[in-house]
Regions:
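Glycine-rich phosphate-binding P-loop
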Residues: 1-2, 48
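Short, small-residue-biased leader/transition segments that mark boundaries at the very start
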Residues: 3-8
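Conserved P-loop NTPase mechanochemical-coupling segment
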Residues: 11-15
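Conserved alpha-helical scaffold flanking the Walker A/P-loop in AAA+ ATPase domains
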Residues: 22-42
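Canonical AAA+ ATPase core
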Residues: 23-28, 49-53, 61-153, 193-195
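Walker B catalytic acidic pair
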Residues: 44-45, 56
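Conserved AAA+ ATPase small/helical "lid" subdomain
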Residues: 133-185
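C-terminal engagement/docking regions of AAA+ P-loop ATPases
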Residues: 170-224
Length: 224
């Protein structure tokens, strides 16, 4: 299952998580689930939502649960949040707080396509929207099984020491007010194991750490 939520200024936290509504026929309140009750949530232009609404995602992103009026609910399993944001110089945006940025596993920047890539895009759209013909390449069960196998990937103590050294270096570096938190180091561990699994290896190598350190850690730094 997937959901897309367009984030705008008048969006409320309940629009993301869900609310209890009164059912006159049953004479009781029932839960109207929000977009977080899914497997993949696309939060489009997240930094256009107000800080209060952005905070509505924090609990479900970190704890995999949603609390509505004191009652905790579990979203989908697995649960992923993919967010896009406008450039910070755009009008009407709210910078994401450090606590929320730290909950995103990876941050990628989307650059403009090359000439060849743009020509390929035009070719794909010559007849019909290619998105309409997309088919699933993996089932939910296969995805969960792959995640379980990736968790078994071996990480030598030297590799773990290497990752901690990188994190500690960010905490001591001049010009950085806040370095990588332990959550960031754990995120790097998860990513390098998954990367090694996708490369067909049962173990992590130093190049895996070097490949993923920037996309996993850079957005967590607070620079002066």
């Amino acid at each position: 299952r997937r959901q897309r939520q367009m984030c705008i200024r008048d969006r409320l936290p309940g629009d993301i998580t869900g609310i209890n509504v009164y059912d006159r026929q049953k004479n009781e309140f029932t839960l109207r689930k929000g977009p977080v009750f899914t497997n993949i949530l696309l939060a489009d232009e997240l930094n256009r939502a107000t800080p209060r609404t952005q905070a509505g995602l924090l609990e479900c992103m970190e704890e995999r649960q949603v609390t509505i009026e004191g009652v905790s609910y579990t979203p989908g399993e697995p649960f992923f949040v993919i967010a896009t944001e406008n450039p910070i110089e755009s009008a009407g945006v709210f910078p994401l707080p450090e606590a929320q940025l730290d909950r995103f596993l990876i941050k990628l920047s989307m650059n403009l396509p090359t000439k060849e890539e743009e020509l390929r895009i035009l070719e794909l759209y010559m007849e019909e929207d290619p998105l309409k013909s997309l088919t699933a390449v993996v089932s939910l069960e296969e995805l969960l099984a792959a995640r379980a196998e990736a968790a078994k990937i071996f990480v030598h103590p030297c590799i773990r020491e290497y990752m901690v050294q990188i994190a500690e270096a960010t905490r001591r570096a001049d010009g950085i007010l806040a370095g990588v938190s332990p959550r960031g180091t754990l995120g790097l561990l998860r990513c390098v194991k998954a990367y090694a699994y996708l490369q067909g290896r049962s173990y992590v190598i130093p190049d895996d750490v070097r490949t993923l350190a920037v996309p996993v850690l850079a957005h967590r730094l607070v620079c002066s």
